[in-house]
């Protein structure tokens, strides 16, 4: 049997375009904010519609992608998950941290549509992605419920730190500055508490970029208050 090489070259097959130009505010996992819309545009080499034949019959897909916004040359065998307060160390392979030997991410997203565009070929319209704008995609696979869903799976430390939801208050005048098509997604992102898990100062004003807007907010207890929204 031929021995497999110790290293391989991955080819970027596509890039995803989302509402997040920076890492701050991106949901901690895919599917938490299904209103988030993304577009996957293939590189010129992989714009052959035949490669997507049959994919329209699946409701969800897996994306294999690169943590392009958090690349490090070195990796650590242990990391400190933000969901544990940033103080407890856990083995890197027991987390989804980007600081791993191969900085690859895996996300399950809803496949809403496949569009054919004359300038870029087939485009996948997805919902619920937890990726930064421009993230390179290395592979796409169909989500297969009977094989991929494990209702009785143990969830480790994540079961102790489930994502909580905040009540979002935004003055109507500010809310009207948000395009109607983006409001539900922004509401979902804010409700899922985009702050780092270890920051709880009610006086601190946080800022995040979303869909061409800069949103400033504070969080006091279980309520998030939008303080300002400006056009970038």
Located regions from the model:
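Mixed-charge, low-complexity intrinsically disordered regions
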Residues: 1-104, 116-125, 129-232
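Conserved positions in beta-strands of structured domains
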Residues: 17, 109-112
